[in-house]
Amino acid sequence: MFMFEKEQTVLDFNGYKIGGQPGEYPRVLGASIFYNKHETVLDEHTGKIDKAKAEALWNRCLELYDATGHWYFCQIIAEFGEAFESYIDWFCTIDDQFPFLMDSSAPAALAHACKYVTEAGCADRAVYNSINGSIGPENIEAIKKSDVDAAIVLAFNPGDPSVRGREKVLAEGGVAGQEKSMMAIAEECGIKRPILDTAATPLGLGSGGSFREILACKAIHGLPTGGAYHNMTVSWTWLKRWRKSGILERYKDAGTLLEQMGHHHFGGVEGIRQAAWSSADIGCNI
């Protein structure tokens, strides 16, 4: 059986484990919800949602967890602080166990979410997504002042998508406008439970580096590692030109191949049924 020589860190989220050697623990899947134009969102500013429909989607994840043993991050996406409050309240009302990711392209909304989960007493379940080259001093300070101690740490290097380039972002710094490395920033923020993200990029834009970086992260840092590998296909401009042909169907689940390379988290609530069974099958073979 393949094993890493480097000791592998195992992180605990309310009894649910992530990390370790290949096959040591079940894969963790990230089910994203409330993203732009998501079917459950009625008002993206206030966070008004179709609660019944949203709960049905989450219950599907729980059913698959019972069947496969793979647990889930609920990846909550919002662009406004008020919406974050609504979404987090909803999730903590229907589930008191599983962790959730706080994800946004709006720095102010993420900073607000850090403050809110601290005040609400659920920061131990919250994962900041993500510490990357665009993080500003306001968000660094927001994490520091909060009780959030878990974060996705992104290995995205816009100038060099190779393994060396991604490692430079993670461990050396001086890239993407940041003097410090992403791991150094995470430590400064008080992050005790870092999860590495290899920054999946489309084919032709460094996707090979995304694959190889999984093994590099595990071998060098010994930390839980994964990524949103569906981005490789959904952001692939060549594939979009073939959207109406059968070729899309043959490529859209390509991300499951990455299970064979030791990563620990995934992405996407609508297609979770297919990913869950593929993940379980490959995990058993490992």
Task: Tell me what each language-model feature is.
Residues 2-19, 24, 36, 266-286:
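Extended, intrinsically disordered, low-complexity segments
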Residues 9-174:
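Active-site beta->alpha loop and helix N-cap motifs at the rims of alpha/beta catalytic domains
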Residues 139-286:
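Catalytic alpha/beta core domains of metabolic enzymes, predominantly
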